[in-house]
Regions:
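Transmembrane-helix signature of polytopic, membrane-embedded enzymes
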Residues: 14-19, 104-126, 145, 159-161, ...
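Transmembrane alpha-helical segments
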Residues: 27, 322-344, 366-380
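Transmembrane-helix motifs of polytopic, lipid-linked glycan transferases
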Residues: 88-111, 149
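Aromatic/acidic, Gly/Pro-rich catalytic loop(s) in extracytoplasmic/lumenal soluble domains
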Residues: 390, 394-462
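Transmembrane alpha-helix segments characteristic
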Residues: 17-23, 260-264, 271-293, 307, ...
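Transmembrane-lumen/periplasm boundary regions of multi-pass, lipid-linked membrane glycan transferases
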Residues: 45-49, 66, 72, 82, ...
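Hydrophobic/aromatic-rich transmembrane helices and adjacent perimembrane loops
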Residues: 133-134, 140-143, 169, 174, ...
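Specific aromatic-rich, kink-prone transmembrane helix
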Residues: 103, 122, 142-165, 308-312
């Protein structure tokens, strides 16, 4: 096993500079949409439960789509607030993202030395998907941090500590359990240590997500439901290519040409097959295989592969030079994405207009990803998707009949439905029918489709 030497002052200074760049990319835009949770709908599932944890709600979230580590990490940030604070939660998210950059540096140095550490840290710093999700109080960057740290411990030969880290990674998000494979690979011939590491992994998971085990039946139901939805597909991915190519595209969108240098590093690792190579290749292989049944091709699903590809891209001086040059492309993309986040979200204007003009007793129907579900009078329409039943409330006559007087729609659902109208004919008819109605309010911003572009409020009652 290759063990990295103690970092020099120059190397630590370089890491500090990289972390400063990473912080700048992540802090700018982290306040987008606040005080509403508009960056990612999963924040509505996670932050309120973290708030309840420190305000008398108990340790059992009663919801097991995800395990509990992120609730524990976010909980202290919610102390002192009378309601869930998405801004405070995002401060924690940014800190987790920066820790992920440092972990990539650690993994690279432990596996291949200084060049790999440098490229690993730079690559994760500029990777568009890592930058974006480091601003959101969701599980994916915490999972990636756990995976990267586990791999660093494995290539350093510290199997027992790697077991603890693997258990924490699985407690961040269930795919962390796949770390069992590289753990076994790293421990070939040292089976007693492997058994101890696996026991410590299980213990770390149980300690931090105990109610997943206590309520194993309910947890399995939630996990199975999430898996079925991911395997069925999702709104917006209907015209994607086959899954391997779709996730290759997501990787390119995150790393650009740096991903190609990473593939060269993979080829070198396949040829040389050192212990570090085998650890990283085994994780890359098992994680990639786990994505094959998935038809919901979210960019966040490739996040755990990003640090590994970046480290492999730096495993030698020539590769590292090419990788650092290639990193300029995702750096530019991330800066451009960050600039887009500085524009005002039109959903904030819609929420303010509703607060001023819609009577408090009027009930409101809203598409997902338009308004948060906090107001009691708001009724969330179901998200269309493959193998999902049509929501009968997507009919103006039905909305009127059930007493819903206002309707909020946005491009996040409507434009995707209309783009896939052959898959969602009834939903598409509903959105086309709205073209005959003058909206009571419309907020729009110019720009590309990386951010919400418009939201409309319709008066449903005659």
């Amino acid at each position: 096993v290759q063990v990295a030497r103690r970092a020099s002052a120059a190397q630590l200074a370089a890491l500090g500079s990289i972390l400063a760049l990473a912080a700048a990319l992540r802090v700018v835009g982290a306040g987008s949409g606040l005080p509403l949770p508009l960056l990612n709908p999963d924040e509505e599932n996670l932050v309120p439960r973290a708030w309840q944890l420190v305000h008398g709600g108990g340790l059992d979230p009663g919801w097991y789509d995800y395990p509990s580590l992120l609730f524990l990490a976010l909980g202290p940030s919610q102390l002192g607030f009378d309601e869930p604070s998405y801004g405070a939660a995002r401060v924690v998210a940014v800190a987790i993202g920066l820790a992920g950059v440092a972990a990539a540096w650690w993994l690279g140095r432990a596996a291949y030395g200084t060049f790999a550490g440098l490229v690993g840290a730079v690559g994760v710093t500029v990777a568009t998907t890592h930058v974006a999700y480091s601003r959101m109080a969701v599980t994916d960057v915490l999972l990636t941090l756990g995976i990267t740290s586990t791999l660093a411990l494995l290539v350093s030969g510290r199997l027992e500590w790697a077991g603890v880290a693997a258990g924490l990674a699985a407690s961040a998000k269930y795919p962390g359990a796949l770390l069992v494979v590289p753990l076994v690979v790293a421990g070939i011939g040292r089976w007693r240590r492997v058994v101890r590491a696996l026991g410590l992994a299980a213990l770390a998971f149980v300690v931090t997500s105990p109610f997943v085990v206590v309520h194993a039946g309910a947890a399995w139901d939630d996990i199975s439901r999430v898996q079925r939805l991911a395997q069925a597909g999702w709104l917006g991915f209907e015209d994607d290519p086959i899954t391997p190519l779709a996730f290759a595209m997501r990787t390119w969108e995150s790393l650009g040409p740096l991903a190609l240098v990473g593939l060269v590093g993979v080829a070198v690792a396949v040829r040389r097959r050192t212990r570090a190579d085998l650890v990283l290749l085994s994780f890359t292989g098992v994680y990639s295989l786990s994505l094959l049944p998935v038809e919901a091709h979210f960019d966040r699903y490739v996040l755990p592969l990003v640090p590994v590809l970046c480290v492999l891209a730096g495993r030698g001086p020539w590769l590292a030079t090419a990788a650092l040059a290639a990193a300029l492309v995702p750096l530019w993309w991330s800066v451009d994405d960050t600039r887009a986040l500085t524009e005002r979200d039109p959903r904030l204007d819609a929420a303010a207009w509703i607060e001023r003009h819609v009577p408090p007793r009027d009930r409101i129907a809203a598409d997902p990803s338009t308004l948060p579900r906090d107001p009691p009078r708001l009724v969330r329409l179901e998200l269309p998707g493959p193998d999902r039943a049509f929501d009968p409330r997507r009919d103006l006559a039905v909305l009127r009949r059930v007493g819903l007087r206002w309707l909020v729609v946005g491009d996040g659902v409507a434009d995707r439905v209309l783009a896939g109208a052959s898959h969602y004919p009834r939903e598409a008819r509903f959105y086309r029918s709205l073209e005959a109605i003058e909206p009571a309010f419309e907020a729009r911003r110019d720009g590309d489709d990386r951010r919400p572009r418009w939201v409309r409020v319709y008066r449903v009652y005659p």
